[in-house]
Regions:
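Active-site neighborhoods of divalent-metal-dependent phosphate/nucleic-acid chemistry enzymes
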Residues: 73-108
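PIN/NYN-family metal-dependent endoribonuclease catalytic core
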Residues: 8, 19-53
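Short, hydrophobic/glycine-enriched beta-strand segments
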Residues: 8-14
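Intrinsically disordered, low-complexity and often Lys/Arg-enriched segments
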Residues: 1-6
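Residue-level detector of structured alpha->beta connecting loops
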Residues: 33, 105-106, 126
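PIN-domain endoribonuclease scaffold, especially VapC-family toxins
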Residues: 37-81
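Short beta-strand and adjacent tight-turn residues that come in two discontinuous sequence segments
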Residues: 111
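Acidic, PIN/NYN-like endoribonuclease modules and their adjacent C-terminal/linker elements
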Residues: 114-128
Length: 128
C-alpha cells in the first residue's frame, strides 16, 4: 500500500468521472485519509461513460486518468478475473468491482449504485 493510509476504498466507475467528486476523492487520498484504488476495467468503464456523456472531452480523458494514477500511487488493482464468475450481485456487470475490492483488500466500495452491492453479501468479504 502506498502512503500511510490504513483504510482502503475501491472506487466504482460512477465516482471516477464527475469532476467535483473525483477531485475531492483524489485530494483526500493525497492526504492519506484513505487509499483510493480501482482497476483498469473500472477506469475503462468510467472513461467510456464520460465520453458518452461529454463527447467534447474525449481527447482529454486519457490525460485525466493518467494524472489520477500519478496522484495516487499503487491505485490500480489487477489479478482478480478468477473471482468474477464466483460472485453474485444483482447487476452481474458489477462483479468486477467487487472482485477488485476483494483482491485489493478494500474496506469499502465507493459508488452511487448502492443497490447493486447488497450490504449483507458484500460484508461477508469484509467490505462495507
Amino acid at each position: 500500500m502506498a502512503g500511510t493510509a490504513t483504510y482502503t476504498v475501491v472506487l466504482g466507475a460512477n465516482v471516477l468521472y464527475p469532476i467535483a467528486v473525483i477531485d475531492l476523492i483524489v485530494s483526500l487520498a493525497e492526504t492519506n485519509l484513505f487509499h483510493a484504488r480501482w482497476s483498469d476495467s473500472i477506469e475503462a468503464e468510467a472513461a467510456r461513460n464520460l465520453a458518452e456523456k461529454r463527447p467534447e472531452l474525449a481527447d482529454k480523458i486519457p490525460g485525466r486518468f493518467a494524472a489520477m494514477r500519478r496522484a495516487i500511487p499503487d491505485c490500480i488493482i489487477g489479478h482478480f478475473d478468477h473471482l468474477i464468475d464466483k460472485l453474485r450481485l444483482p447487476e452481474p456487470d458489477d462483479r468486477h468491482v467487487l472482485a477488485a475490492a476483494i483482491v485489493g483488500h478494500a474496506d469499502a466500495i465507493v459508488t452511487f449504485n448502492l443497490k447493486d452491492f447488497p450490504t449483507d453479501y458484500v460484508r461477508q468479504f469484509g467490505i462495507e
